[in-house]
Amino acid sequence: MSTGRAAPLPLSVLDLAPISAGSSPAEAIRNSIALARAAEEWGYRRFWLAEHHFVAVGSSSTATLIALVAAATQSIRVGSAAVQLGHHSAASVVEAFGTVDAVFPGRLDLGLGRSGQRRTELLDAARTPTAQRPSAEPERVVDGLLLPQPFAAAEVVSSPLIGATAAALEFDGAIQPDFGDAVCDVLAFLDGGLRVGDVELHAVPGEEADVQVWVFGSSKGQSAQVAGAEGLPFVANYHVSPATVLEAVDAYRAHFRPSARLSRPYVVVSADVVFADNDSEATHLASTYGHWVHDIRTGRGAQPYLDPTTASPLTAEQRAVVDDRIRTQFVGSPSTVAERLDTLARVTGADELVITSVTYDLEDRLRSHQLLAAEWGLTDSSR
């Protein structure tokens, strides 16, 4: 924070290009570009874009949007958070990012995630009788950081939308590679080529592109382990799975082996933040976040983000589905909430925080990031 940190921990932005109720994908994309320009001015290190399909966000074609953002900015790093390797081949990913890197060299972060492949595991878990499932960890507070009881994602992952999405994005009969193998294929294409049988394939463009590879994960499972074993930086998703953030970073560090890319573990932790000039305003702006998460968790996917001035409050039953996410949001004025972000960084040992903020109006999203940049001490011009 600006009041005590001589060298502030770097902050980055994770943007979903959310579509607000009554708005359009085109406006959401323009808003993301505007936010990226502002983030660069305010001293944020990176601007990352999520990949989601067939829902009310504008970032489905992540590499395309990354190129648009890179063209609209000068120096901020731009990347994916994360490419869903279950829906893309390693070759297509490297060629896409290599193409953008050819025009904007040295500015791209290639974040890789397991979506698509992980769905099969969750479906298997959903089919397991409740009595045979491991009991959930109880809620706890570790050195000031809230770790709520884990959400049972297996209960909703079998929704028709998720199944239809997989069917639309994957070829019939295609066998998805193991996530670790897919990551290694990406690295091979970037480093000099991938041998398939007796043929060595070279990604053009893509080979030797100046792209930094990241792995995203929410638990102590394969993503954290692969990131560590391959010597890659790791992003732990506190904003999506707050209950498991510590086990994720611990597993990553335990499996870490130095590589040509990274000599020591590097951890980024995500946080969902809504800052405003006072606590009551911030609470009002964040009041429809629970509605948005509820749609996602009950299988409808992200719907247009509701206007807090007209939306009805969540019912008690709806609130129970999203309670962990609401209570682990960082909502308020900078003076009352920034210390909680400091706690998140300290307890997880994060080298960097990545901030996501979803509000109905772009102006409120911009103001949230601006206030945080000023409070954190990223730049004197943030206030």
Where are these regions (language model features)?
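Hydrophobic faces of well-ordered beta-strands that scaffold small-molecule active sites
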Residues: 11-15, 47-49, 77-81, 108-112, ...
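A generic, well-ordered mixed alpha/beta core segment in the N-terminal half of proteins
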Residues: 89-137
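A conserved active-site cap/scaffold subdomain adjacent to cofactor or substrate pockets
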Residues: 222-243
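N-terminal beta1-alpha1-beta2 module of alpha/beta enzyme domains
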Residues: 1-78
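Conserved, mostly hydrophobic/aromatic
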Residues: 11, 39, 43, 51, ...
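An alpha-helical appendage that flanks or caps ligand/catalytic pockets
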Residues: 2-7, 130-204, 243-348, 380-383
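Active-site mouth loops of central-metabolism enzymes
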Residues: 15-30, 60, 82-91, 207-219, ...
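Short, acidic/polar
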Residues: 26-38, 218-225, 334-343
